[in-house]
């Protein structure tokens, strides 16, 4: 897909685990090591310019069970990174996994709570250049996205 001309300027957003997301933030090599499923594109985040960005969907081998303060904060950092990449002007599209049954982020390895998947998906489709990150803790439930 990456080699196809229509994806030459695409940012690939993959489902990350929190541990490797944090490792990337700290500049550790495991932050760019390939993973399973759509995290196979994780190494692309180490390129210049980055071709991928991660959205944490779980930790310690399990999907996030609830949208607690820690999960909200980690997702906020991920969305800030994605927003900064989109604002760079290098990308004309984002590619990410979608579960059309739920209108939610697709997931296969981790099984995060469906509400989290829906909120992440809704925030991803709202990422636009020059706009504030769509994920914030300024609204009820800790997200800038309306709850279903």
Identify the residue ranges that each predicted region occupies:
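Macrodomain-like recognition of ADP-ribose-binding/processing modules
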Residues: 1-148
């Amino acid at each position: 897909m990456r080699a196809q001309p229509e994806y030459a300027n695409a940012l690939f957003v993959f489902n990350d685990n929190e541990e490797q997301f944090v490792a990337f933030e700290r500049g550790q090599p495991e932050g760019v090591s390939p993973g399973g499923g759509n995290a196979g594109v994780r190494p692309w985040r180490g390129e210049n310019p980055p071709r991928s960005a991660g959205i944490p969907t779980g930790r310690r081998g399990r999907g996030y069970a609830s949208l607690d303060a820690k999960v909200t904060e980690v997702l906020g950092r991920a969305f800030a990174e994605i927003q900064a990449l989109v604002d760079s002007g290098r990308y004309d599209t984002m590619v990410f996994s979608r579960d059309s049954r739920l209108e939610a982020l697709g997931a296969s390895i981790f099984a995060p709570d469906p509400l989290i998947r829906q909120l992440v998906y809704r925030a991803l489709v709202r990422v636009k250049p020059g706009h504030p990150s769509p994920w914030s803790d300024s609204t009820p439930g800790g997200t800038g996205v309306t709850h279903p």
